[in-house]
Amino acid sequence: MIGKLKGTIDEIGEDYVLVDVHGVCYVAHCSARTLSKLGSTGEACVLFIETYVREDQLKLFGFMTALEREWFNLLQSVQGVGAKVALAVLSTLPPGELANAIALQDRTAVSRAPGVGPKVAMRLVTELKNRAPAFAGEAINIGLKQELGEGVAAAPVADAVSALTNLGYSRDQAANAIAAAMKTAGEGADSAKLIRLGLKELAR
């Protein structure tokens, strides 16, 4: 089973990328959001892979993060959601926004994804609501680490993000604002300072 691909981009199609790994090219089907974040032909590429084996067919699905891959599998645990719909949802909502939508039972946000009607959207937010908080927290942490590196002070940052979401901002907005605030405040800043700077970022 293939878990990750590291190679160079050979071709990017409408719903897939062809990754050249030492002369062997793999087709990985991806969300539109993932494809938009990839580089150009010839550039390096790293994808987390979910391998599907169906009778005589082997299919690879590629993701920028392990979290996106986890969401891909979690979405398909809901009746009526297959790989195509799961990718459509992830094309419309990144993990942080998806977790937030489910936590808030926001069927409208989920139903924006192609192929997701009212009934499927209802099942998604209902059946996954108990799983969303954990995923949301992980999404924020991953996003902040990507912005700032691994040396992020977890507690003040998490408290600041939580405070901004309680004020009505989306998790992605809050995480991005606090990431910017951390760059201004520097390491060791407390949550109060991060909240104040984060609000300034959001007011711009």
UniProtKB/Swiss-Prot annotation:
Give the residue ranges for region: Domain III: 152-204
Task: Tell me, in one coarse class, where this protein mainly resides.
Answer: cytoplasm
Recorded GO molecular functions are: ATP binding; four-way junction DNA binding; four-way junction helicase activity
- List, alphabetically, the InterPro entries matched: DNA_helicase_Holl-junc_RuvA_I, NA-bd_OB-fold, RuvA, RuvA_2-like, RuvA_C, RuvA_C_sf
Keyword match DNA damage: yes
Region span, Domain II:
65-143
Query: Where is the protein found, in the record's own terms?
Result: Cytoplasm
Give the source's domain of life in one word: Bacteria
Short name of one Pfam family:
HHH_5
- Spell out the GO cellular component terms annotated for this protein, sorted alphabetically and separated by semicolons: cytoplasm; Holliday junction helicase complex; Holliday junction resolvase complex
UniProtKB keywords: Cytoplasm, DNA damage, DNA recombination, DNA repair, DNA-binding
**Region entry Flexible linker, spans:** 144-151
Acyltransferase recorded as keyword: no
Gene3D superfamilies membership: 5' to 3' exonuclease, C-terminal subdomain, DNA helicase RuvA subunit, C-terminal domain, Nucleic acid-binding proteins
Query: What are the BP-aspect GO terms?
Result: DNA recombination; DNA repair
Domain I: region residues: 1-64
Q: What is known of its domains?
A: Has three domains with a flexible linker between the domains II and III and assumes an 'L' shape. Domain III is highly mobile and contacts RuvB.
- What is stated as this protein's family in its record? Belongs to the RuvA family.
Q: What does this protein do?
A: The RuvA-RuvB-RuvC complex processes Holliday junction (HJ) DNA during genetic recombination and DNA repair, while the RuvA-RuvB complex plays an important role in the rescue of blocked DNA replication forks via replication fork reversal (RFR). RuvA specifically binds to HJ cruciform DNA, conferring on it an open structure. The RuvB hexamer acts as an ATP-dependent pump, pulling dsDNA into and through the RuvAB complex. HJ branch migration allows RuvC to scan DNA until it finds its consensus sequence, where it cleaves and resolves the cruciform DNA.
How this chain assembles, per its entry, is: Homotetramer. Forms an RuvA(8)-RuvB(12)-Holliday junction (HJ) complex. HJ DNA is sandwiched between 2 RuvA tetramers; dsDNA enters through RuvA and exits via RuvB. An RuvB hexamer assembles on each DNA strand where it exits the tetramer. Each RuvB hexamer is contacted by two RuvA subunits (via domain III) on 2 adjacent RuvB subunits; this complex drives branch migration. In the full resolvosome a probable DNA-RuvA(4)-RuvB(12)-RuvC(2) complex forms which resolves the HJ.
What protein name is recorded for this chain? Holliday junction branch migration complex subunit RuvA
Tell me which species this is from: Rhizobium johnstonii (strain DSM 114642 / LMG 32736 / 3841) (Rhizobium leguminosarum bv. viciae)
Q: Which gene encodes it?
A: ruvA
